[in-house]
Amino acid sequence: VRLNTYVDADELRGMEADEIIVATGAYPRMDGFILANPGTPIKGVDQAHVISSIDLVTDPRRELGKHAVVMDSAGGYEAIAACEYLVEKGLSVTLICTHGNMTPYAQTYGRDGPAVERMMRMGAFNLMLRQQIYEIGKDHCTVGLVRMPGNAMTQVPADTVVLVSPNEPMRAIFDVLRAEGRAARLIGDALSPRDAQYAIADGHRAARELV
């Protein structure tokens, strides 16, 4: 067992493993892509105050300002976690969801309601449904109905903008191995970014098949 070890394709070549299972996860997609409106990416995503949820929680000294917008087009618990983190920091937070209800995939397990109640008790929290960011400015976001640009657009204050989109699979090692003709298998988010329990199930099945 090797813990806390970076491995690249060159190191894997020397291990002479009987089977290689790639479970390298995924990374945030930050190009402004919105699943509900793929032809209209968000403008202004290349600014310093536009970050991922990972950027948010891994840099506690980041200057966040007073107002934050969380843009959720994935529909899972990640957006709720980002909002709760920001509310606890004392920011006024607006959650913008492209869906017709808040984080629909988190509702499956009843995780959304208690989180909203906590955030409403802790501080300023606002929810906008069936909306998307069309453009990010220096201190605000231009928000409107999904796939209806120009219709009743709203300016939402935003010193920090957190984008929560479907992630990109991190499969570079797998692609190198396959190009060399070596057998390898993808599991978890490296195969298809989903909620955590699916990745756990993939790992469980892969381990059982090796026994």
Enumerate the predicted regions with their spans.
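Short aromatic-enriched loop/helix-cap "lid" or pocket-rim segments at secondary-structure transitions
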Residues: 34-35, 107-109, 199
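A polyampholytic, Gly/Pro-enriched intrinsically disordered region
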Residues: 68-71, 121, 146, 207-211
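Short, hinge-like loop/turn segments at secondary-structure boundaries
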Residues: 39-40, 111-114, 203-205
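Conserved sugar-transfer catalytic core signal across GT-A, GT-B, and GT-C glycosyltransferases
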Residues: 82, 173, 199
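Predominant activation on well-ordered alpha-helical scaffold segments within soluble catalytic domains
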Residues: 84, 116, 174, 204-207
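An active-site-proximal "capping" alpha-helix that borders the catalytic cofactor pocket
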Residues: 197-211
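Glycine-rich dinucleotide-binding loop and its adjacent helix/turn
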Residues: 1-2, 10, 29-89, 178-195
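A Rossmann-like FAD-binding core segment of flavoenzymes
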Residues: 1-30, 46, 52-58, 64, ...
